[in-house]
A protein has these predicted regions:
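Periplasmic solute-binding protein
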Residues: 1-5, 95-103
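Ligand-binding pocket segment of bilobal, Venus flytrap-like solute-binding proteins
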Residues: 2-87
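Soluble non-cytosolic domains of exported or imported proteins
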Residues: 26-30, 49, 111-115, 217-225
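Solvent-exposed, polar/charged alpha-helical surfaces in well-ordered, non-transmembrane soluble domains
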Residues: 34, 53, 57, 115-122, ...
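Sec-exported extracytoplasmic/periplasmic mature domains
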Residues: 37-41, 56, 60, 75, ...
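Solvent-exposed loop/turn segments at secondary-structure junctions
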Residues: 67-71, 91-94, 107-108, 128
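Mature extracytoplasmic/periplasmic domains
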Residues: 103-203
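Conserved C-terminal helix/tail region of periplasmic/extracytoplasmic solute-binding proteins
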Residues: 178-237
Length: 237
């Protein structure tokens, strides 16, 4: 269905992919359970953390991971001379990001708490601290850097091709970094060809990937219970 011509055209003008991704109806959850039960017979495990090590050691050849964990896995595999790649299903995927926000219930009208929360968010959003966090956790920040090119330069430092690299590909990050309209090509990396399907594609997916991705919404308590029961049935029976 997701790859049908009708659905692909509808994606250009509607939120149909978002609706599909966030469908928690009883009927859909039952269908998902049936698929997962069949998949489980050919699956090494249903667990994310151990999957990273299993990819590096060669126990498994395919692993569904969050993009940052994918970057971590590829980095670790490189140390052993193993080159792994990252891909997003052509049917679509979950579009997500890490960020900080102030909870109304946490602030509760307290001016000092609000000031402290704002100070922390301002501090953690500084480009230099954004880079420190990205280096440590392997996940892309929602911060592009504003007037500062520091974060883009960090991406270039991580993934840009060396001067003597023979086969390179342009990797356009203009959609993410500010100022792209005024300075075309300013935010285009020259990366080694294999890198275009590795870490940089996990950190900064191309626009073609974003167009077939949607944000997962917070499920209701009823939906969470329904999905939790489904997972129990899949894993335990």
């Amino acid at each position: 269905k997701l790859l049908s011509e009708e659905f692909q055209k509808a994606m250009e003008t509607t939120h149909c992919l978002t609706d599909e991704l966030n469908d928690t109806s009883e009927q859909t959850v039952t269908k998902v359970q049936t698929i997962l039960e069949k998949m489980r017979k050919n699956s090494y495990s249903l667990e994310t953390d151990s999957g990273k090590a299993d990819m590096v050691t060669g126990k498994v050849v395919l692993n569904m991971q969050w993009s940052g964990d994918g970057v971590y896995t590829m980095d670790e595999a490189e140390k052993d001379g193993l080159e792994l790649s990252y891909a997003v299903p052509e049917e679509g995927s979950n579009l997500w990001f890490d960020g900080f926000c102030m909870m109304k219930n946490g602030i509760s009208g307290d001016a000092k708490k609000k000031q402290a929360a704002q100070a922390f968010i301002n501090y953690i959003s500084r480009p230099d601290n954004v880079i420190r966090n990205m280096y440590y956790v392997g996940y892309t920040s929602v911060i592009a850097g504003g007037d500062s090119d520091l974060i883009f330069k960090y991406a270039d430092w991580c993934y840009g091709a060396e001067e003597d690299e023979e086969e390179v590909s342009p990797y356009d990050l203009s959609y993410f970094f500010s100022g792209a309209k005024e300075t075309p090509n300013k935010y285009v990396l020259e990366v080694p060809k294999p890198q275009a399907s590795r870490q940089v594609s996990a950190q900064y997916p191309e626009q073609s990937v974003l167009k077939r991705s949607a944000v997962m919404q917070c499920f209701s308590e009823e939906a969470n219970r329904r999905i939790s029961r489904m997972w129990i049935r899949v894993r335990c029976f």
